[in-house]
Amino acid sequence: GGADVFADNCSTCHVNGGNVISAGKVLSKTAIEEYLDGGYTKEAIEYQVRNGKGPMPAWEGVLSEDEIVAVTDYVYTQAGGAWANVS
């Protein structure tokens, strides 16, 4: 599932929804609204996963289509839930 994809591929930089590379660019709903083109939507999150931005690598061609969809859904859900207050 998405949690496993995240743990295996994203958590090095985004541990617990944070960001160890770029302060403030965390995975809370508020930060996603501010920093992602398109804001807090699954489409915007999926675009970021596929294409990367700045120090974040593109994952298209690395992750399978199913993994991209799963991790997108996971981040979307966590951003409005468990990670809502990450800063």
From Swiss-Prot:
Location of this chain's protein in the cell: Plastid, Chloroplast thylakoid lumen
Keyword Lipid biosynthesis included in the entry's annotation: no
PROSITE patterns linked: CYTC
Post-translational modification: Binds 1 heme c group covalently per subunit.
Keywords: Chloroplast, Electron transport, Heme, Iron, Metal-binding, Photosynthesis, Plastid, Thylakoid, Transport
GO cellular component: chloroplast thylakoid lumen
GO BP field: photosynthesis
InterPro entries: Cyt_c-like_dom, Cyt_c-like_dom_sf, Cyt_C6, Cyt_C_IC
Domain of life: Eukaryota
Binding site for heme c: C10, C13, H14, M56
Signal sequence annotation: none
GO molecular function, one term: heme binding
Subunit composition and interactions: Monomer.
Summary of the function given for this chain in its UniProt record: Functions as an electron carrier between membrane-bound cytochrome b6-f and photosystem I in oxygenic photosynthesis.
Family affiliation: Belongs to the cytochrome c family. PetJ subfamily.
Protein name: Cytochrome c6
Organism whose genome encodes this protein: Euglena gracilis
Top-level taxonomy: Eukaryota, Discoba, Euglenozoa, Euglenida, Spirocuta
